[in-house]
Structure formats: C-alpha cells, structure tokens
UniProtKB/Swiss-Prot annotation:
Covalent link (Glycyl lysine isopeptide (Lys-Gly) (interchain with G-Cter in SUMO2)) residue numbers: K929
Subunit note: Interacts (via N-terminus) with SLF2; this interaction links RAD18 to the SMC5-SMC6 complex. Interacts (via BRCT domains) with RAD18; this interaction occurs in a SLF2-independent manner. Interacts with SMC6. Interacts (via BRCT domains) with RAD18 (via C-terminus and phosphorylated form); this interaction is required for efficient repair of UV-induced DNA damage.
Pfam family, one: RTT107_BRCT_5
Top-rank lineage group of the source organism: Eukaryota
KW Ubl conjugation (keyword) present: yes
One Gene Ontology CC term in the entry: centrosome
Organism the protein comes from: Bos taurus
Residue ranges occupied by any BRCT domain in the UniProt entry: 2-80, 121-199
Keyword Transmembrane helix listed: no
Domain remarks: BRCT domains are necessary for its targeting to ionizing radiation-induced nuclear foci.
Keywords of the record: ANK repeat, Cytoplasm, Cytoskeleton, DNA damage, DNA repair, Isopeptide bond, Nucleus, Repeat, Ubl conjugation
Location of the region described as Disordered in the Swiss-Prot/TrEMBL record: 312-332
InterPro entries assigned: Ankyrin_rpt, Ankyrin_rpt-contain_sf, BRCT_dom, BRCT_dom_sf, BRCT_SLF1, Slf1
Name the record gives this protein: SMC5-SMC6 complex localization factor protein 1
Gene field: SLF1
Length: 1055
C-alpha cells in the first residue's frame, strides 16, 4: 500500500467469536482502526467470512466499500503491511459450482466498480424512501443500509412529493396501496436485498429473471435428473414451463411485488407438475418392465406345460416297451437334467461377471471424473492467478494467421520515412495500419535499431505502444506462424543471434552494467531504462502465454487429453521446444542466479531501478516455472518430486548468505505459488538440518506438513537441539556433499564419479564455518570452469576478480598489504562490502587471518562498512574470535556495540562461545558497557534466538500450507461443494481398485487421497500440537495457528 493511502477502518461480519478474536490479534500488527460493532459504522474495509445478507454486508455493497475475505488480514499480517485488495475481494473469483448465484458472488465488486466509474455517492443516491415497517431493530438496520447507499429516508407523516420507493412489510403493502397516499410504487423489504445482491447493474429485470431461471433449472437437472430414464421428457417440460413463465412475465402489467409473488407461485406449481410428470414416466417405464417380465414368465410356464404333457404321453407309450428301454430313457433324462443345471449355473456366473464388470466401469468413470475435476481446479487456480479466467469459453485459435503484406506503396513510404529519420511519421503510419496488417519484422527491427542508437528518444514510448497492441491483437498462441514471428522479432536487430541471446544481454546490461552485444548509444542511463522496457515487454509476452495455456487447459479439462499444438515462445527459449525436457536447463539456471543476485542488490538500496528489475526477473522466473508445471500436469509428469528435488534445493543452497528476514522477503516476492511453496519447503528442510532434526525425503503433501513438519517446528524453538563444536578455520578439506549438489544444480551432464572420490556423504550441519568457506570458494572455482554456469559475482563492478570472485580488496586483506589497502580505499567508488563468490567480504578476510592493522584501517576509513554481514550467520566477529584474534574482537565491539554479541551462526553459536577464558569474556563484554552479566545476556539472547527460529519456521510452514491448499483445492469453500464424504469414498475406492486397473495409478490422485484423509484427521492431530508453538506470541506463528484452526472448523462443519 502507498504511504499516503487513507487509514484502514476495519469491520467484520459472519465470523464466530473465537475466529474474530484471532483476526483481531493480527490487526494489532497493522496500521488500522478496528470497529468491533454489530452495526455498520462507515468502515473502509469489511472482512466477510462468507457471502451473506447481513446489515454490514448490504451496507458495504451499497456504499461501494471493499468487501474482502479473511485471507486479506492473514497475508497482510504476514507481510507486515497492507497488501493490494484486488485479489482478496469477494467477486474477484466466481465459483461456477457454488450455491450462490454469480450475481451475488460478484455484488461487492460490481457495486464498488460501478460507483467508482459513475462517481455516484451510493447505490440509492436518487431514492426518496418511505419506510412502512414497525419500529424495531430491523427497521433501524434498514435505515442504516439505505443511508449507507445515500438514500433520502423520509418519515411517513412528513412525506413530500417525489417519493420514489415505499418499502413496507408484506402485511401492509396491500392496505397501503389501497389508500394511495404516497403516489409511488411499493416494494417488499426483500427488494433491497435483491436489488443489491441479485440485480444486474446494466441489465433489466427480465434478463435477470431469465438468468435466475437458467441457474435454477441447471442446478435441479444436475442434482435430480442426471441418471433418470425420463431426463429428456423432464428437460422438455422444464423448457416449456420456462418459456410460458417468461412470456407471462413480459406481458404482466400488475404491481412488481404481486407479479413476482404470483410468478414464483406459478413456477413452483409448474415445477411440481413437471416432477409429477417425471414420476409418471418412471412409473410407466417400471410398469412396462413389470408387464414384460410377466409375459416372459407366462410364456415360460406355457412351454413347461407343453413339455410336461408331451413327456406324459411318451411315458404311456414307453410303458409298453421293455425295461431296458425304460432304463435307457432314464439315463438320457439324467444327462439332460445335468446339462440344463450346468448351463443354468454358467448363466448365473456370466450375469455376475457382467454385473461386476459394469461396477468396475462405473468406478473407473467416477475416478476419471474426479481426476479431471482435480486437474480442472488446478488449471483454474492458475488461470485466476494470471487473471485469465473467463466465464464464456473462447474458440481455439486453429486458423493460420498469414502475415498480410502491406501494400507496396505504403511499405515504400514507411521505409523512406525511416531512412529519412522521420520516425514520428513512420510510427504513426504503422499504428494506423496495425488493426489490418501485421507489421513486417524488418520494419520493427529498423525502428528498434534507431532507438538503441538513441536516435528516437522522444518517440520510443510510441514504439512500445505498437508492440503492446501487436501482442493484444495478434498473440503468439494464435497460430504457429505467430509464435515464429515473435521469436524472430525479439532478438537483436544487428546481431540476430536469437531470442535468448537478447534476453541475456538485456539482463546483464541492467544487472551488471555490461556493454551491449554491439556498439550503441553512450547514454548509459537512457540505455538501461530502454533495456528494462524491453524486458517488460518480454515479461508481458510470456505471462500472456502462461495465462492462455492455463485457460485452455481449464476450458478443455473435461476431455481425456489435450494435445498442445504449435511451439510456444516460452518453451522454445527455456527448453528448446522440448516438452519432456528437465526443468533446470542452462537458461533456467542462469535466470535463477540472476533473480537471486538481483534480490541481494535490491536489499542494499532503495533504488527504484533495482527494485523494478528484481520484480521483473522474479516475474519472468515465476512465469517460466508455472508454464513448465502446468504443461507437465497435462502430460502426467510428477511435478511435485521434480520441483522439490531441483528448484527448491537450488534456491536454498544459493541463498546461504541470506538472513531469515531476507529469505522472508525473497520468498514472498515470488509471483508463482508453486515456487513459493517449494522454496519455503527447501529452506525449512535446511532449518531442520541445522537443528539436527531428521525429515523424510518424500514429496510435499498435507500429510507431511501435519505429521512431520509441525512437530519439527516445535523442536526448532527448543533449546539444546544444536550440537556446539568449536570450528577450525584453516586446513580442512572441502565438503564433498556440496560438490555433489553443485553438479546437480549446474545441470552438468557429467557423471558424478568423475572427479569425485567415493566417500560417505557428510552432514552440512556438522561442517564448521571455515570448512564451508573453503567449500564455497572451491565451488566458485568449479562453477567458473563450467561454460554453462559463469560466475555472476565477478561482474559486480569494474575491478578485476579472480576465479574465486576475490577483488583487489580481498587479496590485500588476506595478504596483510596495508599500504595497498589504504590506496584502494582512497579510490572513488570503492565498495568495502563487496563479496566474493562465497559471500565473504574484505573485513571477513582480515578478521579471519588476524590482520589487525587492516581491520583498523577499514574501521577508520569506511564508516559504511557492514559489521553484521554474514555467511551462514558467520559475522566478522565470529571470524576473529573463532581464530583467537581477541584484539580484533575488541576493535569490532568498540565500533559495533552489543548487537554484535547477539548474532548467531547457522549452528546457533554466539561470538563469545568461542572464548574459553572467562576473564577475556568479561573484558570483551565490558567494552559494550552493558549493565548486566554475561550469563543473563546470553540467556536473553538465546531466548530471542529460539523465538526467531520458531517465527521463521512458522512463516515457512504457513507459506507451504496456504499455497498447497490453494493449488490443490483444499480450502473450505472448495471442499464444501465437492462433498468431503463423497470424495473420501471415491478415493478409498480408488485405492482399493488400484491393483486391478491402470486408471487409478495416478500420482495426483494418490496425493489427493492422502490429503483428504489427513484433512479428516486434522482436528485430532492438532491436539498434539507442540506447546511452544501454541504459546508463541509471534505474528507468523499466530497466523499459522489461525489457518489451522479455520481448516479444522471448516472440515468439522462440512463433515
């Protein structure tokens, strides 16, 4: 939110007391005024538990105020500031399967936007209303709703002329109408609710009634008549009923209220008649089947009777024959009886097999429907995040778009205008013809080349307007030809080395101040702004592709499989057009490193350019990840395992030098819910590893979060879980486990056995800080030797660096070259806080090697030096005291104060933990001039540390939980209309039949089955929640508890 935005005035409606108190605690962390009243008090934001018809809900709609979900408070509290309201507004998402009508779902958003568009003060601003209602609490509530919508409420005794509405109870309407005192139409009280929640603002009442009937009939048909034999007869009856009702409504001239009542009564009568017709049809079919069975039985009886008569006749004839013939006949009869019994038995088994097969098919169909519905929800959630959801299904673009040639004369004109440097006129000509023709690539390249040379400074914005209009009118997914068009367009007009080459040059130019791929304008600032604008266009391009893919898969998710035709720009750039490619290709690796580095740079300053660049890179990365995931879901790929093993581990290891606060900001900045979820999990695993807590390697699931991560969260906030070891700084071998991880992260195709000895894996949590330093520097050398993963830190400034990323400052401090250090510090633009590839600063190196004079010169000459800079929590003071350099420690404490003593490394060690002598500890502690003992100071620091650990873990788990429930449809709203019990039965059937059919061997269904079962057991599981989690006062922990409580309550209500 902007700093000058008005202060939030919050009210709530629809919440239970416990939940309202929990949300109220979160509001204490934010800048707002919370009004705890049952009456509407002219708030700015109303937080509603559900869609309802309460006084506050109706009044907020009438006044055009923000009506938001509770997630707005939870997420804002987690972020520490008020977030943008748009995505949290009731009406932002329309649930097709909800029992609320689309009009009611969108009412708050529609009225707010309508009042903002028209400038009207309220929904009733032209009303003069007389209320004929008994004076009580309800009448006062109606007055507040009307006044919120700026209606003029007039007493009945003082009724002037010009009354527009008379609102009365049903009992008084007829009597008051007969008096005709007000000369105005009468409306029932219900009319206010219908006007606000059901009325289409731009449509008349007939169309609204028509849409209501359509919704009603479709719901009834889906619920009652799907499997009935008389479905077609019922459908016809409903259509006739609806047509007759609409016709009568159009010709109705009576009062609005009486008309609506009669129409509703007639429609109900006709609906009952139609149900009777259906019952008659069912009865007729049942009678027909019964008659048919009787006829069959009668025919069988006649056959049996004739056979019996024939046999009796034959028996009399055979009595005259010899006993031998009789015995022969008896044996023959026995054979016939045995054969008949055998055939009858076989027919019974055949019928049973047929019935069993039908049951299997029916179960298979249910499971396939469930799988399609689950995928459809994931696609829909993805489309909503990219603002791509549509109510109507759009036709697929399957027609080739031909690059209609410009008329030769116009082409010659534009070419001559560009050659004559009449760029304004050339751009205007292109703009005027853009709706009818697709501009040739070479013309757009000619203009871009001049823009890069700073020849079109004034009109460069008009050029990007052409590109935006081109993307809107002719998107890349329109045809394979348009996809190729954009791939040709988005490359350097001079070098023509491809799309990825241009993207790389643009990012390096903005991030590292590198030169362009060819000679361009010397206006550095203007060039960087231009390069950033080109990156914005690229971001819009790929974001539109993700939006289209999500929408397309959502629209066609009912089909068994949808083949994605054509080549997408995103797929071509990052995965060379290969749909089955692994996630971490060279472009994706480089984009990940750039995104992480841009976040580090953003945190160093408030520069707008750096912040915008970080936002763009995060958005591009999120769009690429989301595209790969959605495409993988359509192909049946297990994206959960791939994402957890690849991207999550990559980012976690690359952010070793991030503090917990930096990681919170970094994870929250991801636009991709998938990326947030998996990076949060990887960081949480690392946190558990540092606390010696074992975690299983299975993919992320709700079961794992509840039964594994929640208990682990309690252990992170318990003292004594860490193993204290005094590290040795010099001479240890690198940690080979990280080298193995590095090979995986860099996407190198070599075998792990090459260059790596067969040794047992080491635990990173047991590696000392110095060992990690040597390890990270060796990684720097290794990564620089790889062509597909060039070192990025070497490009920070104009100073030369070695393969480890060490600058001249680093080397001077390592080698104790004081004179050279003083010379370097006197140079303009020198950065004393520059880091090498492993994250160490020159001050770290001086403290590590015990070069006291170098430390003294840095502290005296560089007041901007960062004494809290850390790698895995290792600060310069840690470095000095862990190597026994007490004098350096005293210098640092004199300049940094007591805050330096409170810093812990990744293993929880304080700087004074490295000091064995109690006397030296007291001397160092005395420098800070704290009026306390060392023991009390350490106890308070330890308590604060474990509180931070618990808060950070709660943040990570909250991110996992919220994003997981959002992606897989485990929110209470989604489960309510699906039916939790029905889902459980289907998924249990899925597991029971898993071994007998291939339909059920689907990882997504297996995951969802475990999630549903965990949801049902969640209330019992939370009874064993760790005590320290329950009592922690931190905002993230409280938000986590509120989320879990809401999930438990919703599951209990649904079940």
């Amino acid at each position: 939110m902007e700093d000058d935005a008005p202060k939030h005035i919050i009210q709530m409606t629809g919440f239970k007391v416990e939940e309202k108190e929990a949300l109220g605690k979160l509001l204490l962390k934010l800048d707002c005024t919370f009004i705890k009243s049952e009456k509407y008090k002219n708030c700015t934001h109303l937080i509603a538990e559900r869609l309802c018809k309460s006084e506050k809900f109706l009044a907020a709609c009438a006044a055009g105020k923000w009506v938001l979900t509770k997630d707005y408070i939870i997420h804002s509290a987690q972020s520490g500031r008020w977030l943008d309201e748009t995505t949290y507004e009731w009406g932002y998402k329309i649930e097709k399967d909800s029992h609320y009508s689309p009009q009611m779902q969108s009412a708050p958003k529609r009225w707010r936007e309508e009042l903002k568009r028209t400038g009207a003060p309220g929904a009733f601003h032209k009303w003069k209303v007389v209320l004929l209602v008994r004076a009580d609490k309800r009448s006062d509530s109606l007055v507040r709703v009307l006044e919120a919508g700026k209606a003029n409420v007039i007493l009945p005794k003082n009724s002037p002329t010009g009354i527009t509405h008379v609102i009365a109870s049903n009992a008084r309407i007829k009597a008051e109408q007969e008096k005709d005192d007000f000369k105005a139409p009468f409306y029932p009280i219900q009319y206010l609710e219908d006007f606000l929640l059901e009325k289409e603002i731009h449509n008349d009442e007939d169309s609204q009634t028509n849409s209501t009937w359509k919704n009603h009939s479709s719901q009834e048909k889906s619920n009652d008549f799907r499997e009935n034999m008389g479905f077609l007869e019922m459908k016809g009856t409903l259509k006739e009923t609806m047509c007759r009702t609409q016709k009568e409504m159009k010709n109705h001239d009576e009062d609005v209220t009486i008309s609506s009542i009669l129409t509703e009564h007639q429609s109900k009568e006709r609906f009952r008649d139609s149900r009777k017709n259906l019952k008659f049809v069912k009865m007729r079919n049942a009678l027909g089947r019964h008659t048919y069975r009787n006829q069959e039985m009668k025919k069988k009886d006649e056959d049996i009777q004739s056979i019996y008569t024939l046999r009796k006749k034959r028996k009399k004839e055979k009595e005259r024959d010899s006993r031998k013939d009789i015995e022969h006949d008896r044996s023959t009869l026995r054979k016939h009886i045995y054969r008949d019994q055998k055939e009858r038995k076989n027919s019974v088994f055949a019928g049973h097999a047929k019935e069993s097969k039908t049951k299997d098919i029916r179960t298979n169909v249910d499971i396939v429907d469930l799988k399609n519905a689950l995928r459809k929800h994931i696609y829909r959630a993805q489309a909503v995040r990219y603002r791509g959801i549509r109510i109507d299904k759009q036709p697929a673009y399957n027609v080739e778009v031909k690059n209609a040639e410009f008329p030769r004369g116009i082409l010659n004109l534009i070419e001559s205008l560009i050659e004559g440097q009449f760029f304004k006129e050339a751009i205007e000509e292109l703009s005027s013809l853009q709706a009818h023709y697709i501009p040739p690539v070479y013309l757009l390249h000619a203009l871009l080349e001049n823009i890069l040379q700073d020849n079109i400074d004034t009109f460069s914005g008009r050029y990007f307007h052409i590109l935006s209009a081109l993307l809107h009118l002719h998107p890349p997914w329109k045809s394979p030809a348009m996809s190729t068009y954009y791939l040709e367009l988005f490359q350097c007009p001079t070098c023509m080395k491809g799309t990825w080459s241009l993207i790389e040059v643009l990012i390096r130019s903005c991030l590292f101040n590198e030169s362009f791929c060819h000679q361009i304008s010397e206006n550095i600032i203007g060039s960087k702004v231009l390069h950033l604008t080109l990156l914005k266009f690229f971001f819009n391009l790929i974001e539109s592709e993700v939006r289209h893919l999500s929408q397309k898969l959502y629209d066609w998710s009912d089909s068994q499989s949808l083949k994605i035709t054509g080549k997408a720009v995103l797929l071509e750039i990052f995965w060379s057009g290969n749909e089955t490619s692994g996630l971490l290709t060279k472009p994706v690796n480089m984009l990940l490193e750039w995104t992480i580095y841009s976040h580090k740079e953003k945190c160093k300053s408030n520069d707008v350019f750096r912040h915008e660049l970080a936002y763009l890179l995060t958005g591009i990365l999120g769009a690429a990840i989301d595209y790969w995931i959605v495409l993988g879901l359509n192909m049946g790929r297990n994206v959960m395992r791939h994402m957890s093993d690849d991207v999550g581990s990559y980012v976690s290891l690359s952010c070793d030098d991030f503090s917990s606060q930096d990681l919170e900001i970094f994870i929250s900045s991801f636009s991709s819910s998938w990326l947030q979820m998996f990076v949060a999990e990887a960081v949480f695993k690392k946190l558990c590893l540092q606390n010696s807590i074992s975690i299983s390697s299975e993919p992320l699931s709700l079961q794992k979060m509840v039964y594994s991560y929640l208990p682990a969260l309690g252990k992170t906030g318990v003292r004594g879980t860490r193993k204290m070891q005094k590290p040795k700084k010099i001479g240890l071998r690198p940690c080979f486990e990280s080298q193995r991880a590095l090979i995986m992260l860099n996407g190198a195709k070599q075998k792990q056995g090459e260059g790596l000895p067969e040794i047992p894996e080491l635990n990173l949590a047991k590696c000392s800080s110095s060992l990690k330093r040597l390890k990270k520097k060796s990684e720097g050398e290794l990564s620089c030797s790889k062509e597909n993963c060039p070192s990025l830190v070497t490009k920070i400034n104009f100073h030369k660096t070695n393969l480890k990323g060490e600058t001249a400052l680093h080397r001077a401090c390592i080698n104790n070259q004081v004179d050279r250090l003083i010379l370097l510090l006197s140079m303009p633009g020198i950065d004393i806080n520059v880091k090498d590839n492993a994250g160490w600063t020159p001050l770290h190196e001086a403290c590590n090697y015990g070069n006291t004079v170098c430390v003294q010169e840095i502290l005296q000459r560089c007041p901007e030096v960062d004494l809290l800079t850390q790698v895995d929590g290792v600060t310069p003071l840690h470095d000095a005291l862990s190597n026994g350099h007490v004098e350096i420690g005293k210098l640092l404490l004199q300049h940094g104060g007591p805050v330096l003593l409170q810093q812990r490394n990744s293993k929880g060690e304080l700087p004074l933990d490295y000091v064995v002598s109690s006397q030296i500890k007291e001397e160092l502690f005395a420098i800070t001039k704290i009026e306390d003992t060392v023991e009390n100071f350490h106890a308070q620091a330890e308590k604060h540390f474990y509180h931070q650990q618990l808060e950070f873990g709660s943040f990570l788990l909250s991110r996992m939980l919220l994003n997981f429930c959002s992606i897989f449809g485990l929110s209470s709203e989604s489960l309510a209309f699906k039916g939790l019990t029905h889902l459980s039965e289907l998924l249990i059937a899925c597991q029971n039949y898993k071994e007998t059919t291939s339909v059920h061997t689907d990882w997504l269904l297996d995951l969802y089955a475990r999630n549903i079962m965990t949801l049902q057991k969640l209330p019992n599981a939370l009874k064993e929640l760790p005590e320290n989690v329950k009592v922690c006062p931190g905002v993230h922990t409280e938000a986590l508890l509120v989320t879990l409580e809401v999930m438990c309550r919703s599951v209990t209500e649904i079940s």
